[in-house]
Amino acid sequence: MSEIVIRHAETRDYEAIRQIHAQPEVYCNTLQVPHPSDHMWQERLADRPGIKQLVACIDGDVVGHLTIDVQQRPRRSHVADFGICVDSRWKNRGVASALMREMIEMCDNWLRVDRIELTVFVDNAPAIKVYKKYGFEIEGTGKKYALRNGEYVDAYYMARVK
């Protein structure tokens, strides 16, 4: 397999990112609804305070996306949360791990982030396994956290504290 290259997401990446998030295997594990608009993705990739966007590329193609949101409130400025997705054709090939390593490196050494938070549906075992691999722990459960395919699903609150 070719090398996984992690870089900052550019506006030109929005179509590839939109296509990844439009995959049913991907959006069912996010809070996104089906059929996101081009405009929404263009806005999401615009520069915003506290937001860092990374993409994973293989042979120049975007195969993964991670957004870091560093809290802007002074008393929570040491905290970030993130969302991650991987093209379903590239699952189980190290893409999520490469994005996670780079995100943790940025948070630990460049962004003064001591706590990284996330939510994950309780039935998303592959994602939970990756998060635990990088030191995230389950801190609680949100009952009926979100609606997915017509049914409520619970989510874990997880965090990694430096």
UniProtKB/Swiss-Prot annotation:
Organism: Escherichia coli (strain K12)
Keywords: Acyltransferase, Transferase
NCBIfam families: PRK10140.1
Name used for this protein in its record: L-amino acid N-acetyltransferase AaaT
Family to which the UniProt record says this protein belongs: Belongs to the acetyltransferase family.
Transferase found in the keyword field: yes
Enzyme class: transferase
Gene for this chain: aaaT
EC nos: 2.3.1.-, 2.3.1.53
Gene3D superfamilies: 3.40.630.30
The organism's place on the tree of life at top rank: Bacteria
Residue span, N-acetyltransferase domain: 4-162
Phylogenetic lineage: Bacteria, Pseudomonadati, Pseudomonadota, Gammaproteobacteria, Enterobacterales
Function of the protein: Catalyzes the N-acetylation of L-phenylalanine and L-methionine using acetyl-CoA as acetyl donor in vitro. Cannot accept L-tyrosine as substrate and propionyl-CoA, succinyl-CoA or (S)-methylmalonyl-CoA as acyl donors. Is also able to acetylate and thus detoxify several nonhydrolyzable aminoacyl adenylates, but not the processed form of the peptide-nucleotide antibiotic microcin C (McC). When overproduced, provides complete resistance to leucyl sulfamoyl adenylate (LSA) and partial resistance to alanyl sulfamoyl adenylate (ASA) and phenylalanyl sulfamoyl adenylate (FSA).
Membrane-spanning ranges: none
